[in-house]
């Protein structure tokens, strides 16, 4: 609703089901966002999930992002999540502001809206560049070989 009031219109796809779905559907209706919102539902087919993520311009994870960060970056989709890093899982470190996504102030919907708006203002027309940056982050730092070397360094005291 905040972004729509500013004349910014985005399509939203909710993938998954759960206890919040009815509340989300009510909020979508309240803010007259039905034409731009798709409740896909639960999906456990990796090929379908890959297509959904690959074709998304941005993943917004208002809660703890965890492995979702790895999943979406792996398919070239940047992510936005909250900045309360003590509550986050370690995977939040894959989000590099302005490159592979961004952060918004924890529990602040206005700042979330600003982060989304800022992302699209900065990255409009740069989808392939962003996709490649996401791939590179995963390939360079979030693969078994790199992680194994980090563990070895800890045990070797380096």
Roles of regions detected by a PLM:
Residues 50, 68-77, 92-93:
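Short alpha-helical segment that forms part of, or immediately flanks, the ligand-binding pocket
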Residues 1-12, 17, 29-31:
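Short hydrophobic signal-anchor/transmembrane segments that target glycosyltransferases
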Residues 124-156:
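A charged, aromatic-enriched C-terminal amphipathic alpha-helix characteristic of glycosyltransferases
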Residues 15, 22-43, 47, 55:
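Nucleotide-activated donor-binding/catalytic signature segment of Leloir-type glycosyltransferases, i.e.
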Residues 58, 76-85, 99-100:
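Structural loop-to-beta junction motif characteristic of Rossmann-like glycosyltransferase folds
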Residues 51-64, 77-78:
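Acidic donor-binding loop of glycosyltransferase active sites
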């Amino acid at each position: 609703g905040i972004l729509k009031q500013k004349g910014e219109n985005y399509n939203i796809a909710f993938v998954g089901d759960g206890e919040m779905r009815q509340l989300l559907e009510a909020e979508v209706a309240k803010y007259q966002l039905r034409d731009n919102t798709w409740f896909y539902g639960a999906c456990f087919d990796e090929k379908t999930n890959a297509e959904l993520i690959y074709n998304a311009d941005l993943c917004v994870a208002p809660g703890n992002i965890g492995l979702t960060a790895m999943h979406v970056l792996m398919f070239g989709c940047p992510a936005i999540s909250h900045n309360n890093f003590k509550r986050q899982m370690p995977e939040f470190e894959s989000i590099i502001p302005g490159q592979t996504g961004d952060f918004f102030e924890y529990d602040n919907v206005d700042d979330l809206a600003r982060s989304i708006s800022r992302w699209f203002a900065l990255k409009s027309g740069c989808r392939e560049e962003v996709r490649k940056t996401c791939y590179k982050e995963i390939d360079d730092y979030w693969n078994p070989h790199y992680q194994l070397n980090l563990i070895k360094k800890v045990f070797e005291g380096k």
